[in-house]
Amino acid sequence: MNQTDTTPAGTGSDGDDRAWRDVLARLTVPAPADLLDRVAARWSYVEGPVEDVFVAFTPEGIASVAPASSVDDDAEFTEAFRQYFGRPVLPASGAPDGVEEALRTGDATGLRFDLRGRTPFECDVLQATLTIPPGELRPYAWVAWQIDRPRAVRAVGSALGHNPVPLLIPCHRVIRSDGTVGDYGFGSPMKRRLLGAEGVDLDRVEATVRRGWVVVGDDRSGLVCMPTCHRSEGVPADHRHTFRTVGEAAGQGYTPCPDCRPMGG
């Protein structure tokens, strides 16, 4: 009995699309009309905060993001996607709704992500990281505390190192406890560029953290915040009070900020 060869010929963006459609056309039993979209992911090239980026997505959500400088061309991006996710990725006419705005504003909390293949721990880490606003920083320990795994700081770093959707899930906003930027999948210079584009003064952050991570209280609002929280940035000196811990601040009548959720709050 002869067996139909279902290996698609041809490479490249348009070639891949035609090749897979040819495979479906040769199937003995007619394929569902939407089978190609269910099997293959799609990719688009969009403007990013510091350079253009490749974005791959499925019906479930955004699956992969990569700065243009991290690959030679779209063929390298699509091949890397195929090897990592085990499925083809074909060109799309555009990115899903909301992606370009999320890259422009730095807020991707309204997007859906396809995180299949990530462990529950990794998904928890990514979900906590997604809540960090643009222009603000958190230490790895903060992420660990947010997911109720305060001792898993190194594991948090490893999970962020495997973030398939950087820039949108902003692992570049997570830094070391000493105030230095730390590692980044696309290199620390790219991490600095991204933070600089968000208005982060890394020299000031490092100088602040060298004195020890403190929380900042505002005696007008009664809130205590992380030092990089947007609420603490503009507190006048005569209303600004620093504490070593949230517990110490609570003893003075302060309430943890609902936005930055300082550790121990």
Indicate residue ranges for each PLM-predicted region.
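Short Lys/Arg-enriched helix C-cap and helix-to-coil transition segments
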Residues: 167-175
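Primarily hydrophobic membrane-targeting regions of prokaryotic envelope proteins
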Residues: 137, 159-160, 169-170
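A boundary/linker detector
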Residues: 177-178, 188, 194, 250
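Basic nucleic-acid-binding alpha-helical/helix-turn surface characteristic of O6-alkylguanine DNA
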Residues: 1-151, 197-265
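Aromatic, loop-rich ligand-recognition surfaces of beta-strand-rich domains
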Residues: 182
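Structural signal for hydrophobic
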Residues: 129, 171-172, 194
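Regulatory, non-catalytic segments
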Residues: 153-166
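A short, Lys/Arg-enriched interface patch at domain edges and termini
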Residues: 186-202
